[in-house]
Amino acid sequence: RIVYAAKGDGVLSAGGACDALGIAPEDFMLNVPAWLGEKPALEAEEDGSCDVLIIGAGNAGTTAALKCAESGLKVILAETQTYDEYDEYACDMAMYNSKLFLDKGTPEIDPMDIFNEYMRLYRGHAHQSIVRDFATRGGEVLDWMVDTYIPAEYTDAYAKTSNYKGNDNFSGICAGQYSFRGMTQWRDVDTNVNMWPFVIRTLHTAFEGLGGEIRWGYQGIELVGGNGEAVTGAVFKDIDGAYKQVNAKVVICCAGDFGGNPDMRLDLSDQMRNLAWSFGKDRTDVASTMGMGRDGSGIRMCLWAGATMEGGPRAGQAAGINGVPGFAFGGAWPCFGGDGKRFMNESLIKHGSNGYLDMLPADSLLVNVTDSNWETYLSYQGYGHETMDRSSDYMVEEVRENMKNYVTGADGFDVRAFARFGKEYSKVYAAETLDELADIVGYTGEAKKNFLAEVAHYNEMCEAGKDSDWGCDPQNLFAIKDAPFFASFSKTSNQVSGGLCQHAAVCTDGSYRVLYGDKTPIEGLYAAGNNCGQRYGIQYATPTAGNSCGSALISGYCAAEHVVESLGK
């Protein structure tokens, strides 16, 4: 039977619902947030015109500009950074089925397997056309850049085709998740310097060689038009503080995310805001959420023109996710908590799997353990951020040498890390017995007894080939039985993980046209990269590391194709 409660403010009524409390807008959510405000009314000096105006010279903006220019269009590329200060965050790019991999013998991957895996991880919240472009066009875009515009000596020196050889015993799927090969990493192997900011400048030079113009130190402020009218340009603020208007037939916004804007981050990143609240922090305080990224100006410009933000939960790049310690050589390993017991399925190592680790109290001990068979165990692992690139022969040899020359004791020893292509090292701890290893990592009393008993129990499950406790993938059940024994360990901070950049942005259609709330396109306005929403759905995920940069490059290229077609070229 249905029970009706007497109605009043917040009192439950039929079916468990309740009356609205009549909260005033200023105490709740605003359709025009304070960080957005009203579109400014600026007096700007006209400063040229073009067929295509592209705002932002990052990954998406650069490929968009280059693709439009080679089609014969007059293109202006505007970038808020000056030429001297220009930088790009990352150098990892997942772009599948490139000749860089295929020519080395890497098997071609079925693009539909890639597409379906990403859509599954996004729980259907991403735009299928945009994700399909990422899955099917990446190799084409990377080959286009490398074959046509990037000097061969730069590709030879810096383009590292991660895991192109594969891994001897890896099945391709771990704990139900695919792991694909396809990340190119642009790094100098000796200095550990990210070389992509240097290499992308060769694309800028090629763009200028095709007649394109780059406006450095041009901060985008507002679009011209929108709200029922065609977008016909944008207003910028130059390095001298003067407002300049550039007119165009089409504008492509590629100005990056809002992760570097504390107010937008607090308001728009519902995941981060509410994660902070779950830690007892003030979710109205911008200091409760941290992160990195751009200033959100491209998104604000689109919103002033009538665009809407994609729905939530809004994906951040690893926002709210903490992982287990890991070894210098990567991989998923048995992990033991502060009480000496396992507490998770370690083979679920991709972004989006470990977020609950944020729920552990401060100073919780986390310990990864393996034994002398560590390299054999590595041959069963996939290709994510957390895994060893066994295609880098010189790095493999150095790791083998480091591990061969292990030093027992509490001081540990250095092992070359596989997180990046360069000279990075991490501590590994060694002991001749598990009892000694327990002392080194800090287990005492009951926790030490639990740890030794848990290892014995874990080894029994490895022998049986089934993890009946946590469901670790059988190919990753690595017994801890042969000395020497190795560990890595750390303690939790109980701090909210801000992750990297934010991937939520404005709603677009499958042609990268920015949409009004009724999902009709805003004439003359396109978006790519982190200005383009619905690329990730609810969370960033890594069947291959580097798909954020890869997606940006691909979306810029594909958006440009649609622009070229719309202009009849």
Predicted regions and their residues:
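Core beta-strand elements of the Rossmann-like FAD/NAD(P) dinucleotide-binding domain
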Residues: 47-50, 240-250, 521-522
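N-terminal Rossmann-like FAD-binding beta1-loop-alpha1 element of flavoenzymes
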Residues: 52-77, 564
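Glycine-rich FAD pyrophosphate-binding loop
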Residues: 70-90
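A glycine-rich dinucleotide-binding beta-alpha-beta segment and adjacent secondary-structure elements
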Residues: 222, 433-436, 440-535, 539
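Glycine-rich loop(s) and the adjacent beta-strand/alpha-helix scaffold that form part
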Residues: 241-320, 543-545, 549-558
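An anion/pyrophosphate-binding glycine-rich loop and adjacent beta-alpha core
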Residues: 299-301, 305-443
